[in-house]
Amino acid sequence: MGTVSRTLRNVLPICLLLLIPNASPAQDPDMLRHFDYDQKAPIGIKHAGVQRRAQATVYDITYESPKGGVVPAYLVVPKGSGPFAAIEWGHWYWQNSSMRNRKEFLDEAIVLAQGGVISLLTDGPVARPGHEPIKDPIDERQATEFIQAVIDMRRGLDLLLARKDVDRQRVAYVGHSYGANVGALLSGLDRRIKAFVLMAGSMSDEVNAQTKGYQEFRQKVGAEKLDAFVAKYSYLDQGKYVSHAAPAVVFLQFANQEKFLTPELAQKHAAIVSEPKQVKFYEAPHSLNAEARRDRIQFLTEQLKLKRLPEAAIAGIPNLYQPPDPNE
């Protein structure tokens, strides 16, 4: 369940590698029920503020998490009456990034509003007020926070699809790093999403477990303890879901300048993903670059049948800063 590149880079993972042989397919109800929630419960939207931009209105909101507490989010609404396409965005978890939250894709979402997109950008559990850092790599919260992140995204879909100005047939998800891991699991779980952009994320714990880095991590943590944890949460291996993403289309964006998720390893991850899919590599660090942004906007424009955006508007979106690794 999660980014092995971050696990091995930081030693202290955001989400551990969860692997068990001969796992059930994603359609297995016993696996899927871990992500059930009460869809009939009130969403509980509350407004905290509003910013009116030239091409869109940005609402600062919260909605209730089925796992407790509230989910802070931005809701970006285009001008006009719709019907609009809808995109959910999942941010990265890079430790010392100021964009380790719903702000990561805000500028991109505002530009896409010109093409007719309503966007929901959420704060993952790590970015919410009162979150306590997890220091133990096999702390149960590694798993429970990942489960909450997935369910909160499903609840966010409920929020979007409850709107009369959203076209239910034009819904996408964009996720980066940890957000890509969440999206990979969603792709085999929630059929309401028609297209996925998964950026710089590992797609299979089984692939990761074959690496030397994983074996070293296993010995460091304690093989018996880690194996027990892995077995308990085996249903969180995103490879069991993204291999069943079809008929949704998946666009995988990988960075060539990764310390762990090398192009060779990334190709093995890409092979796990069901067709139809697209795969592209970029000469960039984990944050990716402007070329990747142009490509995913083009992909989203085609998949969601959006209005073409001015090149100047796309070029004006700032690049995500890549901080140095705090553990090096």
For every predicted segment, state its role.
Residues 259-265:
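Conserved alpha/beta-hydrolase "acid-adjacent" motif
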Residues 267-328:
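C-terminal catalytic histidine-bearing segment of alpha/beta-hydrolase fold enzymes
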Residues 154-213:
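Primarily recognizes the serine-hydrolase "nucleophile elbow" in alpha/beta-hydrolase
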Residues 93-151, 208-216:
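Cap/lid segment of the alpha/beta-hydrolase catalytic domain
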Residues 73, 83-93:
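Short beta-strand element of the alpha/beta-hydrolase
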Residues 245-246, 251-254:
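Short beta-strand/loop motif that positions the catalytic acidic residue
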Residues 37-81:
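N-terminal cap/lid segment of alpha/beta-hydrolase-fold proteins
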Residues 226-241:
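Active-site nucleophile elbow and catalytic-triad environment of alpha/beta-hydrolase enzymes
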